[in-house]
């Protein structure tokens, strides 16, 4: 192959990566509890009446607005709701809580073990989606920022996800 063709093909091969990296950025704004919109608080309190809201963030990306609202239940357990604004109304799109790995369904544990990845989770986040899917985010020791594996569970079927779950 001639040098110009090789260079052109190489440039085209990395172009999508560069374009993805330059995609829409997420603007994150910390929101004081007293400043959370009443409509957001109302949706959260309807889902978890006993929750004490501790903190919130507004996330804006392209034309989407999310609120992440974190709090504590009366039993001391922590919970987080992710809300998306749709047509001027707020709706919960995900509910998250930390669980012990031993508390995860056996099918999820077995699916993770069968994946061939040697992960012993030190943190597990259970993320319930509004469509009935539950995502288990498994964090390995020394890697607190991103899950090392995600396993989905729906209708009695579990699978290791090849891509990061979008919410």
Language model segments and positions:
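Long, terminal "pre-/pro-" and other extracytoplasmic accessory regions
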Residues: 2-7, 11, 16, 20-167
